[in-house]
Swiss-Prot record:
Name of this chain's protein: Extensin-2
Region (23 X 9 AA repeats of S-P-P-P-P-Y-V-Y-[SN]): 70-628
Induction: By wounding and water stress; in response to plant hormones 2,4-D, BAP treatment; in response to L-Pro treatment. Repressed by salt stress.
Function: Structural component which strengthens the primary cell wall.
Sequence repeats: 70-78, 79-94, 95-103, 104-119, 120-128, 129-144, 145-153, 154-169, 170-178, 179-194, 195-203, 204-219, 220-228, 229-244, 245-253, 254-269, 270-278, 279-294, 295-303, 304-319, 320-328, 329-344, 345-353, 354-369, 370-378, 379-394, 395-403, 404-419, 420-428, 429-444, 445-453, 454-469, 470-478, 479-494, 495-503, 504-519, 520-528, 529-544, 545-553, 554-569, 570-578, 579-594, 595-603, 604-619, 620-628, 629-644, 645-660
Organism, scientific name: Arabidopsis thaliana (Mouse-ear cress)
Top-level taxon of the source organism: Eukaryota
Region (24 X 16 AA repeats of S-P-P-P-P-[YT]-Y-S-P-S-P-K-V-[DEYH]-Y-K): 79-660
Compositional bias annotation for Pro residues: 47-61, 70-86
Family as reported in the entry's similarity comment: Belongs to the extensin family.
Region feature Disordered, mapped onto this chain: 46-93, 715-743
Organism lineage string: Eukaryota, Viridiplantae, Streptophyta, Embryophyta, Tracheophyta
Keyword terms: Cell wall, Cell wall biogenesis/degradation, Glycoprotein, Hydroxylation, Repeat, Secreted, Signal
A GO molecular-function descriptor: structural constituent of cell wall
PTM info: Extensins contain a characteristic repeat of the pentapeptide Ser-Pro(4). The proline residues are hydroxylated and then O-glycosylated (arabinosylation).
Length: 743
């Protein structure tokens, strides 16, 4: 359905819901809800359509501004919908979930925050009880789209967000609830859930995990297999709590245990991959200034509620959380005491063999417009954390089948937009975490991996503003995709060229100009020899030992582009790689290449390529498999960078990043896609992925400029201005004066 269709349907839902709730009380078993809105501004975009209500849903909005974008249209109500409270300055209800059949009133949506936006919660299909109230006592809260529960015997859980601004774009729609989902509290600065134990069968609710100590780490709570009585509660009212491994509940006859973590730090290292959920999805924490969850994943069938994760909320006492499969009672409230949180639209998981990854966004502003919709959930979706001022997830990739949980998506940057991450179609392992610690980052459309045996690469962008318009969808990798680096204030990946088959590495594109636009780099199909190198003048460069290429006919030329602006409009979709795509480097402070690849056959020495960097060391570049001549070195003029032998991750400039060991791909012809790096003070790559088949090495793409736009990087026939270099045969080493560079 197009945007217009959605808008029309939303308007219709609003109108019908208003008419039914206000003018058809005879269908209600209880009085309609009181709409008290002492707010400066209130916008009801699309209240839910109650098709058959036994009672009206009371909606309380004592907030300065409230916008109801599109509350869920309840289709059949046996009881009144939940009251929606929003005592905040501004509240936007974009579109609460439309309950289809209600046996009891939906939950009230509380949002005592300055601004709350309910963009468009998922439509619950059958409600036996009211949907959960969404509480957001924060300055601004936007509920873009709460999850549409499909069958409710009781109301969905309330979502509380006492933060300045919180936007729930679309919480996950639970499909069948026997009891209310757990409340999700997240008022703590930091909490680490390493990996709670997977409960297999619950006859009674799992135990709450309380930790009233300064620091508590649950390395691996015991997996209860069959409970005749509730597990013990674990209390943890401490400043720091680490859940090493939350338990994947397999079948719940009773509600999972609540996880309380009133600590200042929260880290979900690896939420448990529940295989079959009899209980609700995980809590979504957003203790950040502003977080937008556009659309959390809709769980399809719940036998019992997920465990509540409590971060210190005002006060909530759940004596014994009800087992939700079919809700006879209301779901738990979701609390999010962050300044602003926007749940734009987390992915609807359709088939999950394990839970999706938690999405962390401790950045000022992050917009998740549309996380990937998992198609089948055997386990609950991952919690989406956003302790940042504002976070918007525009559209993470929809994983279609998960054998393991998706990666957590981190965005600790001021503002991050995930426009449309690639939809992984089959996952044997969890997707990569998306990190964006930059002020503003836009992921327009990362490449959709079609079959993953291992998780996708994390996308890091700690830069002021970065736009990933459309990274290339890798279809089949014989070798790992290139890392995209962008340490510039603003970077746009518009659409890099799709390399189809490389006989030799693509040339690096350097452009030391103030502004450079790559309109459309040539897709190299087969290289007989490398393109010519383009030099940017550097102070002094010393080649201690140039890298031995395997079989080079001639070295590829480096393309330098130290321009202040770079836009990557659309990275190329590599379909089949005989050699890895080139890495895109943004200039880092210092780079050391310790050990170039061993040449197997030398026809002639490789020419040196200089970028005017202070000092560069090549520790160990990837070994090309067949070289006719040595590959040229590619320099980025960054302060200091160590390539020990890293996989190309997508980094945004962070203080220090270590990749110890990416997840093992179960069925991969090639390693997972590389992360994109933005230039950080210091980065150490322990072990880059080995290219599988190289006819020649891929060129690195450097862009050490403040702002760079890759509209579609130029074909290797285009040169950025270099002094002048002509390679009649393998180019001799030419020295540009650089401070000092050692190979």
């Amino acid at each position: 359905m197009g945007p217009s269709a959605h808008l029309i349907s939303a308007l219709g839902v609003i109108i019908m819901a208003t008419m039914v709730a206000a003018y058809e009380p005879e269908t209600y078993a209880s009085p309609p809800p009181l709409y008290s809105s002492p707010l400066p501004e209130v916008e009801y975009k699309t209240p839910p359509l109650p098709y058959v209500d036994s009672s009206p849903p009371p909606t309380y909005t004592p907030a300065p501004e409230v916008e109801y974008k599109s509350p869920p249209p309840p289709y059949v109500y046996s009881s009144p919908p939940p009251p929606t409270y929003s005592p905040s300055p501004k509240v936007d209800y974009k579109s609460p979930p439309p309950p289809y059949v209600y046996s009891s009133p939906p939950p009230p949506y509380y949002s005592p925050s300055p601004k709350v936006d309910y963009k468009s919660p998922p439509p619950p299909y059958v409600y036996n009880s009211p949907p959960p109230p969404y509480y957001s006592p924060s300055p601004k809260v936007d509920y873009k789209s709460p999850p549409p529960p499909y069958v409710y015997s009781s109301p969905p859980p309330p979502y509380y967000s006492p933060s300045p601004k919180v936007e729930y774009k679309s919480p996950p729609p639970p499909y069948v609830y026997s009891s209310p989902p757990p409340p999700y509290y997240s008022p703590s600065p930091k909490v680490d859930y390493k990996s709670p134990p997977p409960p297999y069968v619950y006859s009674s609710p799992p135990p709450p995990y309380y930790s009233p100590s300064p620091k508590v780490e649950y390395k691996s709570p015991p997996p209860p297999y069959v409970y005749s009585s509730p597990p013990p509660p674990y209390y943890s009212p401490s400043p720091k709590v680490d859940y090493k491994s939350p338990p994947p509940p397999y079948v719940y006859s009773s509600p999972p245990p609540p996880y309380y973590s009133p600590s200042p730090k929260v880290d979900y290292k690896s939420p448990p991959p529940p295989y079959v959920y009899s209980s609700p999805p995980p809590p979504y924490y957003s203790p950040s200034p502003k977080v937008d969850y556009k659309s959390p994943p809709p769980p399809y069938v719940y036998s019992s509620p997920p465990p509540p994760y409590y971060s210190p909320s005002p006060k909530v006492d759940y004596k014994s959380p009800p087992p939700p499969y079919v809700y006879s009672s209301p779901p738990p409230p979701y609390y999010s005491p962050s300044p602003k949180v926007d749940y734009k639209s987390p992915p609807p998981p359709y088939v999950y063999s394990s839970p999706p990854p938690p999405t962390y966004s401790p950045s000022p502003k992050v917009d998740y417009k549309s996380p990937p919709p998992p198609y089948v959930y055997s386990s609950p979706p991952p919690p989406y954390y956003s302790p940042s001022p504002k976070v918007e997830y525009k559209s993470p990739p929809p994983p279609y089948v998960y054998s393991s949980p998706p990666p957590p998506t981190y965005s600790p940057s001021p503002k991050v937009y995930y426009k449309s991450p690639p939809p992984p179609y089959v996952y044997s392992s969890p997707p990569p975490p998306y990190y964006s610690p930059s002020p503003k980052v836009y992921y327009k459309s990362p490449p959709p991996p079609y079959v993953y045996s291992s998780p996708p690469p994390p996308y890091y962008s700690p830069s002021p503003k970065v736009y990933y318009k459309s990274p290339p969808p890798p279809y089949v990798y014989s070798s790992p995709p290139p890392p995209y680096y962008s340490p510039s204030p603003k970077v746009y990946y518009k659409s890099p060229p799709p390399p189809y088959v490389y006989s030799s590495p693509p040339p690096p594109y350097y452009s030391p100009s103030p502004k450079v636009y790559y309109k459309s780099p040539p897709p190299p199909y087969v290289y007989s020899s490398p393109p010519p190198p383009y030099y940017s003048p550097s102070p002094k460069v010393h080649y201690k030992s140039p890298p031995p290429p395997y079989v080079y006919s001639s070295p590829p030329p480096p393309y330098y582009s130290p321009s202040p602006k770079v836009h990557y409009k659309s990275p190329p979709p590599p379909y089949v790689y005989n050699s890895p795509p080139p890495p895109y480097y943004s200039p880092s402070p210092k780079v050391y290449y310790k050990s170039p690849p061993p040449p197997y056959v030398y026809s002639s020495p490789p020419p040196p390529y200089y970028s005017p960097s202070p000092k560069v060391y090549y520790k160990s570049p990837p070994p090309p498999y067949v070289y006719s001549s040595p590959p040229p070195p590619y320099y980025s003029p960054s302060p200091k960078v160590y390539y020990k032998s890293p996989p190309p991750p997508y980094y945004s400039p962070s203080p220090k990043v270590y990749y110890k060991s990416p997840p093992h791909p179960h069925v991969c012809v090639c390693p997972p896609p590389p992360p994109c790096y933005s230039p950080s003070p210091k980065v150490v790559y322990k072990s880059p992925p080995p290219p599988y088949v190289y006819n020649s090495p891929p060129p690195p793409y450097y862009s050490p400029s403040p702002k760079v736009y890759y509209k579609s990087p130029p074909p290797p026939s285009y040169y950025s201005p270099s002094p002048k270099v002509e390679y009649k045969s393998p180019p001799p080493p030419s020295y540009s004066p650089s401070p000092k560079t050692e190979y």
